[in-house]
From Swiss-Prot:
Keyword Metal-binding attached: no
Gene3D superfamilies: 3.30.230.10, GHMP kinase, C-terminal domain
Any one GO CC term of the record: cytoplasm
Protein name: Homoserine kinase
Principal place of residence: cytoplasm
UniProt-annotated location(s): Cytoplasm
InterPro entries per the UniProt record, alphabetical: GHMP_kinase_C_dom, GHMP_kinase_C_sf, GHMP_kinase_N_dom, GHMP_knse_ATP-bd_CS, Homoserine_kinase, Ribosomal_Su5_D2-typ_SF, Ribsml_uS5_D2-typ_fold_subgr
Pathway: Amino-acid biosynthesis; L-threonine biosynthesis; L-threonine from L-aspartate: step 4/5
Recorded name of the encoding gene: thrB
Organism: Photobacterium profundum (strain SS9)
Lineage: Bacteria, Pseudomonadati, Pseudomonadota, Gammaproteobacteria, Vibrionales
Family listed: Belongs to the GHMP kinase family. Homoserine kinase subfamily.
EC top class, as a word: transferase
Amino acid sequence: MSVVVYAPASIGNVSVGFDVLGAAVSPIDGSLLGDRVEVAAGEQPFTLKCVGDFVAKLPVEQEENIVYHCWLVFARELDKKNIELKPVSMTLEKNMPIGSGLGSSACSVVAALDALNRFHNLPLNEVELLALMGEMEAKISGSLHYDNVAPCYLGGLQFMVQELGIISQPVPCFDDWYWVMAYPGIKVPTAEARAILPSQYRRQDVIAHGRYLGGFIHACHSQQPELAAKMVKDVVAEPYRERLLPGFSNARQYALEAGALASGISGSGPTMFSVCNDLEVAKRIARWLEDNYVQNDEGFVHVCRLDSTGSKVTGSEL
């Protein structure tokens, strides 16, 4: 018996919702933009093999890999429930660039924990599993935030509420929006991107942030796409993180002049996103970004839609 789970890329913050808003995305051409994890019956308590395009960027030691730590916390939770942990042989297919702003660590965490849970016949419920995912994300980034793991696991656009035992809630979005995702091929560690932010903000920035986020959520629920797009503004992180992203300002300006409804930094960068409601505009922006924002062979551009499913089983073998 074995199971393979795919976990999609995600946009943390979506510009307007620092640490509280996230969206899962998948390319419209059907290609997989995310990590996969296989869990199979093992002869030892735990073994891990790593494959994929970005396997060279992973720690050499198994004990330093986040998938190993996912197994440890999963074992801890099963022990609390007096449920037997099965010996497992795990394989991580690392397709996501690390430090990309696409929720790379979340992809590995979500795929690993979802696959472990399915392999053990779902002993943990959705909220319990999501809490573990947040714990693992905090281990990597240094702070607890669900804006990548929640959409990666649950799909769609997710708003983090973290009250009444509820971690996140889905937000209705717009079916005709395309999301152009451009990764330049350089690395921006989340911890470094957080360190550059100020410890205090001006009152007018706090007011603006509340207005934009409240306006965006309201516009999504009332299905006003033009208003929602106007609200996608970041006064918390983008003004400070721009300096870490070569060419971002010019790329955003081009995207907006070319017809994008909104454009911003995905997560802590360096990936940027541009929202379009016209496929030809999205493709034109994608071509320009490939020529002008991508810096090396590791970079890429995808025209995406929101991934409404989140993590999912893709078979029993990689």
